[in-house]
Amino acid sequence: MQQLNPSEISEIIKQRIESLDVTAQARNEGTIVSVSDGIVRIYGLADVMYGEMIEFPGGVYGMALNLEQDSVGAVVLGSYLTLAEGMSAKCTGRILEVPVGPELLGRVVDALGNPIDGKGPINAAASDAVEKVAPGVIWRKSVDQPVQTGYKSVDAMIPVGRGQRELIIGDRQIGKTALAVDAIINQKDSGIRCVYVAIGQKQSTIANVVRKLEEAGALANTIVVAASASESAALQFLAPYAGCTMGEYFRDRGEDALIVYDDLSKQAVAYRQISLLLRRPPGREAYPGDVFYLHSRLLERASRVSEEYVEKFTNGAVKGKTGSLTALPIIETQAGDVSAFVPTNVISITDGQIFLESAMFNSGIRPAVNAGISVSRVGGAAQTKIIKKLSGGIRTALAQYRELAAFAQFASDLDEATRKQLEHGQRVTELMKQKQYAPMSIAEMSVSLYAAERGFLQDVEVAKVISFEQALIAFFKRDHADLMAKINEKGDFNDEIDAGLKAGIEKFKATQTW
């Protein structure tokens, strides 16, 4: 039997003690007390921040939303089925970030910026916080450059400018998404980057929008952020903020971007669900008290920023360029009720609204824009010169027509002036109709509006107004291509362009059929 020398034993113990790694690791850790409906209550997280990322076992993350005296209420980002009571939860010291940059263009991502289109990983060079403070008053510039939607009724009567927030509001299935998607398609050659955020939509609807953008050649210029109806309420609530951060990347570097939120009613519903599960007190229509702030802090981030802001943000790399983020939020109403809680909130936050009416849609007037109650509060300053000059009488003609049409139902004999106004109104209403996925250029719109404004439609039958317009535009494209190019390039209106349009339409009416 081998005998151990006591000095050897003490030497071995000494070596073991010296090689022991006893570096202390400070970690803020807590224990899950309850898990239900995507909400986790955690005990023991002392130094957690509001909105901080919390790490759970298995690579699942959550976000702290309720900081109470003895526990923290967090919402799980993704599936919570693997979590159970008694598991540990760690603070990360980070707030939620998403990837940003041109690498995301042409891709479909979820609310956390992960690709879901099967085209491989996105190697974005940068990431940014989902929740950011909007630029201050000093850094903003007034809106004076247009965003062409390609719709006659919108660009002529309710113009949208770069950096504006223009609400699209109406009942379900009356063309709200179609209008926004057409606005994105129209930007493919304008240099404006686009972000389309789908909140609580059916996956088939999102796939359809992506396919249409691809067919029109606009997907390469667009980021699609999708939080479909099958996603958790937390991701539907976060998706608009994530999309906004992706759009701000371009704004802050002196570029122009357009973001569509489709739709914010569903985001409010998702937020209501989270708030009620977190046991926050409900208010009107069971929405929490801060539902106004939910939308105001999102929409205030859409703005036009000054050259100084861009220069400061890029550390002098970009000089003399303003940046803009234009927002087109969509709100769905119930039976045309614009006085409900969320619609009134968003109307008061935005710089105007495009109101779509189901009665007009059902009677075949598409896009179903109600010119009477639609308004753009700042877009007038941004309108293209030629469109501004030619669209002056359009809104008046439509407003007078709707008033007189209601009156004419009861009157048997009408005087000549009233009859002329009615007939002109009918033709203008017909002219405002437009097919989906067929946005018009400034020149095409100008030809159309010039014909209406200068009385060239008076002898055209109401039923033939659309075919007249199509033939007229085709004629101008063929025989007056230089004039069309000049209008598209500058958007100016002068005596030369006036004479060119007049001569062209007169020649068309004398020589062509429609």
UniProtKB/Swiss-Prot annotation:
It is found in: Cell inner membrane. This is ATP synthase subunit alpha. It comes from the Bacteria. Produces ATP from ADP in the presence of a proton gradient across the membrane. The alpha chain is a regulatory subunit. It catalyses: ATP + H2O + 4 H(+)(in) = ADP + phosphate + 5 H(+)(out). F-type ATPases have 2 components, CF(1) - the catalytic core - and CF(0) - the membrane proton channel. CF(1) has five subunits: alpha(3), beta(3), gamma(1), delta(1), epsilon(1). CF(0) has three main subunits: a(1), b(2) and c(9-12). The alpha and beta chains form an alternating ring which encloses part of the gamma chain. CF(1) is attached to CF(0) by a central stalk formed by the gamma and epsilon chains, while a peripheral stalk is formed by the delta and b chains. InterPro entries: ATP_synth_asu-like_sf (IPR023366), ATP_synth_asu_C (IPR000793), ATP_synth_asu_C_sf (IPR038376), ATP_synth_F1_a_nt-bd_dom (IPR033732), ATP_synth_F1_asu (IPR005294), ATPase_a/bsu_AS (IPR020003), ATPase_F1/V1/A1_a/bsu_N (IPR004100), ATPase_F1/V1/A1_a/bsu_N_sf (IPR036121). Signal peptide: none annotated. Its main location: membrane. PANTHER family: ATP SYNTHASE SUBUNIT ALPHA, MITOCHONDRIAL. It is a peripheral membrane protein. The record marks 374 as: Required for activity. One of its GO terms (molecular function) is proton-transporting ATP synthase activity, rotational mechanism. Belongs to the ATPase alpha/beta chains family. Keywords: ATP synthesis, ATP-binding, Cell inner membrane, Cell membrane, CF(1), Hydrogen ion transport, Ion transport, Membrane, Nucleotide-binding, Translocase, Transport. SUPFAM superfamilies: C-terminal domain of alpha and beta subunits of F1 ATP synthase, N-terminal domain of alpha and beta subunits of F1 ATP synthase, P-loop containing nucleoside triphosphate hydrolases. GO terms for cellular component: plasma membrane; proton-transporting ATP synthase complex. Disulfide bonds: none annotated.
